[in-house]
């Protein structure tokens, strides 16, 4: 559209292999990239909020996708028939994986669903023939149906998944795996992470703001896990704003 916030449709005939969506775009229309069979990579903008239905349907040469922070939902059939899709990174702002979102992604071998994902709709990972591992970090994630995750359907119409579901002890992932005879590996007991608690003392205090300030000044280095905890304002970056927000929470009400 005119203000460059809504990408309505991508020119399929354009033949581009790599494409960068403008940073001004906050929404990509349904079917916008459908059938773009030359596209191998696409960089999505940090301000994107929603991936609508069938947005990348049958982008058969697409190899990887990074879902940025801010996106809350992956629409139905969003990446269906992306046969060459090997790598998917989902941000911890996504709450829903839509119906058939990754259906027939035959090159996808592993995917991690962050704790933010609370709903996996029916057929989300149907017929993903090489999928061998799915990590589900939300212990209370909701699943819809026995054919939500499977590799293929056998001659008796059974939905077969030869891979492994990873989840926490006594989680809904474990319940799903046991109900539908899927392999399950426990990630251990679930411990809720307190965002901002860098010191690990169970509360947010001045020490946490100081540790973030040290990292900003190069006096210490955060692990990837610590970066997620330190990103207090959840903008995808650990910076001075996180330390300021923590300090604000400590001010008298």
Spans of features found by a protein language model:
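Intrinsic low-complexity repeat tracts in disordered regions, enriched in small/polar residues
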Residues: 37, 58-60, 81-83, 104-106, ...
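Structural signature of tandem-repeat unit edges
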Residues: 1-5, 10-27, 36-50, 60-73, ...
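Cellulosome-associated attachment modules in secreted, modular CAZymes
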Residues: 189-253
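Consensus positions within tandem repeat domains that build extended binding/scaffold surfaces
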Residues: 29-34, 52-57, 75-80, 98-103, ...
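A structural signal for leucine-rich repeat
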Residues: 147-152
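A recurrent domain-boundary module in secreted/ectodomain proteins
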Residues: 172-193
């Amino acid at each position: 559209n005119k203000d460059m916030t809504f990408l309505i449709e991508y020119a399929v005939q354009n033949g581009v292999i790599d494409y960068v969506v403008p940073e001004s775009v906050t929404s990509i229309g349904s079917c916008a990239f459908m059938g773009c069979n030359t596209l191998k990579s696409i960089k999505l903008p940090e301000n994107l909020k929603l991936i609508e239905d069938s947005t990348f349907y049958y982008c058969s040469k697409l190899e990887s996708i990074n879902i940025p922070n801010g996106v809350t939902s992956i629409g139905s059939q969003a990446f269906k028939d992306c046969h060459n899709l090997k790598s998917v990174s989902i941000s911890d702002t996504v709450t829903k994986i839509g119906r058939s979102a990754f259906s027939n992604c035959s090159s996808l071998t592993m995917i991690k669903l962050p704790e933010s994902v609370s709903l996996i709709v029916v057929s989300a990972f149907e017929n993903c023939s090489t999928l061998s591992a799915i990590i589900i970090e939300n212990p209370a994630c909701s699943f819809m149906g026995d054919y939500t995750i499977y590799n293929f359907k056998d001659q008796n119409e059974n939905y077969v998944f030869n891979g492994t579901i990873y989840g926490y002890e006594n989680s809904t992932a474990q319940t799903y795996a046991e109900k539908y005879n899927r392999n399950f590996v426990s990630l251990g007991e679930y411990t809720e992470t307190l965002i901002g608690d860098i010191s690990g003392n169970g509360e947010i205090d001045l020490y946490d703001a100081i540790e973030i300030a040290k990292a900003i000044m190069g006096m210490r280095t955060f692990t990837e896990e610590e970066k997620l905890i330190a990103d207090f304002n959840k903008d995808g970056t650990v910076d001075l704003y996180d330390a300021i927000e923590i300090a604000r929470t400590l001010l008298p009400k």
